[in-house]
């Protein structure tokens, strides 16, 4: 349960909170995270979980946890998401100016958020979320010295979710939920701290949620070819991880099989999304 208390503090303070992730994230990760010419679903799914985690840490200003006197670095996030902290193969994804930064999902900054408040002004009916960052704190602030004492790495950087503030030429997902999907902290924790589930399971779960949740009966038809192209996994991997989600009762699948008149096109399977409860 590595660094579970940092995430649990968010729950204690704010309840079962959520973040909005752009639907274009799946295709962007699949197209940009490859091993040779092929998509690397293991690294893409890690990248997705990484984006979700830093979104929670940024939105609820928990990169530095005053209560636990800890701060979360990339090596910690690797460990939270099932990697050894010394693993180098995924650094190309999360480093400054790495893949996540280059495709515009994140940016790297030393100016991490420390508090937030809602203003009286609104965007699309949502109160504006005003962040205070470490550089905005006065040295006389009661917590300034506490932050500086906890953060021992002088080169400490965090990821800012760019899509929070601007997404597809519109206001960001803090204020515009169009073409996004919701991930709750409960969902994230249910996958991350379950030894029976991994990042690929979470990636596929989020994909099905993005397609089905909010539809009539939370149900939709999706061709297998669509999933394979957008998620970038083999048929065998898709079925293995889909069955894990079915076993957990997160989804139900009504398999339709192949069209008789066209062996190249699959009849859409019907997916029903139940989700973490």
Regions inferred by a protein language model and the residue ranges of each:
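Winged helix-turn-helix DNA-binding recognition segment
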Residues: 58-121, 213-267
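Long, low-complexity intrinsically disordered regions in eukaryotic regulatory proteins, enriched
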Residues: 169, 175, 206, 236, ...
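C-terminal engagement modules used by replication, chromatin/transcription, nuclear envelope/ESCRT
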Residues: 130-140, 151, 252, 260-277
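Short recognition helix of helix-turn-helix/winged-helix DNA-binding domains
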Residues: 1-88, 113-220
């Amino acid at each position: 349960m590595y660094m579970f208390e940092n995430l649990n503090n968010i729950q204690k303070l704010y309840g079962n909170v959520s973040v909005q992730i752009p639907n274009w994230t799946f295709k962007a990760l699949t197209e940009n995270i490859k091993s040779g010419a092929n998509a690397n679903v293991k690294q893409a799914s890690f990248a997705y979980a990484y984006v979700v985690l830093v979104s929670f840490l940024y939105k609820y200003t928990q990169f530095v946890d005053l209560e636990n006197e800890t701060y979360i670095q990339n090596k910690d996030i690797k460990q939270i998401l099932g990697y050894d902290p010394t693993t180098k193969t995924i650094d190309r994804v999360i480093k400054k100016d790495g893949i996540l930064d280059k495709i515009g999902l994140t940016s790297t900054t030393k100016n991490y958020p420390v508090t937030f408040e809602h203003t009286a002004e609104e965007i699309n009916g949502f109160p504006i979320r005003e962040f205070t960052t470490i550089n905005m704190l006065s040295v006389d602030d009661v917590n300034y010295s506490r932050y500086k004492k906890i953060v021992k790495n002088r080169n400490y950087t965090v990821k800012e979710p760019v899509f929070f503030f601007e997404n597809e030429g519109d206001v960001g997902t803090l204020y515009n939920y169009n073409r996004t999907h919701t991930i709750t902290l409960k969902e994230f924790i249910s996958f991350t701290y379950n030894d029976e589930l991994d990042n690929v399971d979470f990636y596929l779960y989020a994909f099905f949620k993005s397609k089905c949740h909010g539809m009539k009966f939370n149900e939709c038809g999706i061709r297998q070819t669509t999933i394979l192209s957008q998620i970038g996994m083999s048929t065998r991997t898709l079925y293995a991880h889909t069955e894990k989600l079915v076993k957990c009762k997160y989804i139900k699948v009504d398999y339709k099989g192949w069209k008789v008149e066209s062996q190249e096109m699959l009849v859409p399977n019907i997916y029903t999304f139940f989700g973490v409860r």
